[in-house]
Amino acid sequence: ILNNKQAITPETTELLGKTFSTSAEMWLNLDAKYQLRKIEKKLSEKKELTYVKAEFRKLMPVYEMNKKGWFVNDVSTVYGIKAERKRIFGDEEVVPENDSMNFCARQTKFDYDFTLRYCNVWYQFAKIFAEKESLPVFNKAGLETIAKNLCSYTLKKDGINKIISDLHSCGVGFFVLSHLQKTYLDGAAFTLGNNPFIVYTARYDRVDNFWFVLAHEISHILLHFDHLVKGCLDDMDSSAGSELEIQADAKASELLHTDEILALGTQYRHYFTLDRLRQISESLQIAAPVVLGILQHYKIIEWKKFSSLRESAKEKIDGEFIKG
């Protein structure tokens, strides 16, 4: 009975009553109270778990993140949820403010019930992954050289991994972290300690999109390093709404020779051929998929044309740089 391996029965209450000179009813009542407390405890624990789960789901898309493998604790338990909250926010009880951002965001698509919270969680995870990186001291001059030669990387056979390697060599972290639903993020730039980081979400998993996002985030680092302690999270579908974004767009366009591409492409607007596209690519020494992406972005070429030039960027990136 003491080890909870045998229940109290009417027969055992009679024996206990005789042994301790008490009534059998007293033992029956004690057992009834004990069983009731056990039920109440289970109900209380179930109620707590239901509440904790509900609050956790308000902050982030739990099912999606669990599927991605982002959690290290069992989020089906109260203990696991509290441990994850502490890992993400630094405090298991913290409730992030819904009306404030700990980062600069460029977005037009917006869901007031989810976007702020989910973007904040995504950013916290980006920093968690960044903390695991070991980088040399940031070399701004080295990054400026990379930026100056950005177009030449697009032409290299393994240009994507080459530029990632060169970024790391000059103290700039890079990794892929997929976006979360309702965040609409393409990329981000932020600093951790004295090192800048670039994160690519591969929301639009195309080679041209990779180079656009990379050029934009490199521009943020070169132009707005002091602002990146808060982080810049970018939805490239949206228009630049702040001075920082306008400046980063202008710098990225310069790095990718956007004006020159548009000048050459506009004259063929109504009769574009693959040969003409490649001529522009060769004359400006920038990969044809990037030229195509720029001309499609500015609606000079329809999206459905030259689909053979569209390739996955993520498939070209070494697995060590893909975090989740």
What are these regions (language model features)?
Residues 1-324:
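Active-site hotspot residues in diverse enzymes, especially metal/ion-binding acidic/histidine motifs
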